[in-house]
């Protein structure tokens, strides 16, 4: 086929750049430190900073913004809440109720 033939489809492909811009590389470097750089940073921290990293008091958690609070803290449900949920969902788990009835029958025998 000839290069100027109307049947030939040509795509515009951007030139591949093997390296990213230096500004972008610097931003990535700042955002994602390597494990080695973390070790170096931790070695240079004064002991006072490490003491402040201890367990937070309840007052500190209340003063912190929602983004600063730990999201992984588990708060167990209260007994009142569990009883309320169980009352609402009595028939929501029939297999659980069947298992309870079977255990009670086995105890009677």
From Swiss-Prot:
Coiled coil: none annotated. Residues 25-109 are annotated as: Disordered. Keywords: Cell cycle, Cell division, Cytoplasm, Protein phosphatase inhibitor. One of its GO terms (molecular function) is protein phosphatase inhibitor activity. It is found in: Cytoplasm. Residues 45-54, 100-109 have a biased composition (Basic and acidic residues). GO terms for biological process: cell division; intracellular signal transduction. One of its GO terms (cellular component) is cytoplasm. Signal peptide: none annotated. It comes from the Eukaryota. The keyword Cell cycle applies. Residues 55-75 have a biased composition (Polar residues). It holds the Pfam family DARPP-32. The keyword Cell cycle applies. May increase cell susceptibility to TNF-induced apoptosis. Belongs to the protein phosphatase inhibitor 1 family. This is Protein phosphatase 1 regulatory subunit 1C. The gene is PPP1R1C.
């Amino acid at each position: 086929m000839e290069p100027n033939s109307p049947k030939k489809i040509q795509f515009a492909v951007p030139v591949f750049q093997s390296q990213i811009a230096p500004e972008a590389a610097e931003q990535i470097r700042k955002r994602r430190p390597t494990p080695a750089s973390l070790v170096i940073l931790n070695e240079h921290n004064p002991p006072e900073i490490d003491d402040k990293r201890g367990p937070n008091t309840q007052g500190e958690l209340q003063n912190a913004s929602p983004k600063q609070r730990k999201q992984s803290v588990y708060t167990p449900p209260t007994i009142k809440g569990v009883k309320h949920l169980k009352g609402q969902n009595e028939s929501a788990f029939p297999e659980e109720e069947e298992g309870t009835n079977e255990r009670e029958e086995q105890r009677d025998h």
